[in-house]
Structure formats: structure tokens, C-alpha cells
Amino acid sequence: MATSTTRPPTGEERDQRPLDIQAMRAGAHRLLAEDPKPSVEELGTVALRLREHIVLAVPEVEEMAGRLPHDDTRRACARACIGEARMRMRLKPGATPAARIARAQRLARSVNALCDHYENLDGS
């Protein structure tokens, strides 16, 4: 099993490169659309890319949510989304192709949700 050595970007790197929301959503959409699903050979690469999107998005959303008041609903929702995304990152790939697709789809849903929070918290 391959492990990811992707590190979260530093604050300086985040300031220099904003998230590419369109690319992140396109990658997520590929797994959430009805057909065609990626082949078993492609699935590992697709899942890795989704994980990388989450690694990039979590610190951004976390930082924006942290600027909101502690009792703000948007802050609580964003933090719940971050927790869910981190939990999904810890899931191991299943033994069957269907289980692997289901895991990747969960990652894709987290990517979409993080994109939503990024846009909503940024005011775009």
C-alpha cells in the first residue's frame, strides 16, 4: 500500500497559490457522476489526487473559519466538514473495486464540501 508523504503547505505557500476550486470540483465530479467511473488502474491515482486536494483545502478553510466568532454557525459547519474530511483521509482502500470506488467517492464529497466552505467563507 502506498502512503502519501504530501505535507500541508506552509502559510507562505498558501498565500502565493490560491486553491484551484474549478480543478478540485472537476476531479470530484468525475467520481460522483453516473458514468463512466475510472478504471481500477486509474482509481488509485484519482484517489491520491483527491487526497491532495483535501490536504491543500483543509488549512485554508480552517484558517478562514478561525477568523469567525466562536458561536458562528458557518465556523461550526466548516470545522465539522474538516473533521469529516480528516476522518475520510484515514480510511483504508477496500478489498474490492466497488469498495475502492466508494472510498474515493467519499473523498470526492469531502472535496466538494471543502470547496463550498472555501467559497462561502471567502465571500466569493
What do these predicted regions represent?
Residues 1-5, 121-124:
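Short intrinsically disordered terminal tails
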Residues 24-27, 53, 57, 81, ...:
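Amphipathic, well-ordered alpha-helical segments in soluble domains
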Residues 40-59:
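Short, well-structured hydrophobic secondary-structure segments
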Residues 80-124:
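Amphipathic alpha-helical binding modules
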Residues 44-48, 72-79, 98-105:
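Short, charged, amphipathic alpha-helical segments
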Residues 2-46:
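Short terminal alpha-helical segments
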Residues 56-76:
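Short, solvent-exposed, charged loop/turn and helix-capping segments
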Residues 33-37, 63-70, 87, 91-95:
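General structural signal for alpha-helix termini and helix-helix connectors
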